[in-house]
Curated annotation (Swiss-Prot):
Keywords, comma-separated and alphabetical: Antimicrobial, Disulfide bond, Ion channel impairing toxin, Myotoxin, Neurotoxin, Potassium channel impairing toxin, Secreted, Signal, Toxin, Voltage-gated potassium channel impairing toxin
Chief location of this protein within or outside the cell: secreted
Gene source species: Crotalus durissus terrificus (South American rattlesnake)
Quaternary context: Monomer.
Disulfide feature: C26-C58, C33-C52, C40-C59
Record GO biological process: envenomation resulting in occlusion of the pore of voltage-gated potassium channel in another organism
Similarity comment text for this entry: Belongs to the crotamine-myotoxin family.
Protein name from the UniProt record: Crotamine CRO1
GO cellular component, one term: extracellular region
Primary role: Cationic peptide that possesses multiple functions. It acts as a cell-penetrating peptide (CPP), and as a potent voltage-gated potassium channel (Kv) inhibitor. It exhibits antimicrobial activities, hind limb paralysis, and severe muscle necrosis by a non-enzymatic mechanism.
Residue runs in coiled coils: none
Tissue expression profile of the protein: Expressed by the venom gland.
Gene this protein is translated from: CRO1
Localization annotation: Secreted
Length: 65
């Protein structure tokens, strides 16, 4: 039974982690994912959610204040 618990934990962690280069769509636009509360300056650098995680958005790099 312990083996099943270990196997489940391993599979859970394997699927929970993301590949090394996550958020490809945001990075292709020259952006970076920031928490949604951050303000992108100028507003035109706010690309929206794109492929960022939940409650995060994509802003052009260096614009998150």
């Amino acid at each position: 039974m312990k083996i099943l618990y270990l196997l489940f934990a391993f599979l859970f962690l394997a699927f929970l982690s993301e590949p090394g280069n996550a958020y490809k769509q945001c990075h292709k636009k020259g952006g970076h994912c920031f928490p949604k509360e951050k303000i992108c300056i100028p507003p035109s650098s706010d690309f929206g959610k794109m492929d960022c995680r939940w409650r995060w958005k994509c802003c052009k790099k260096g614009s998150g204040k």
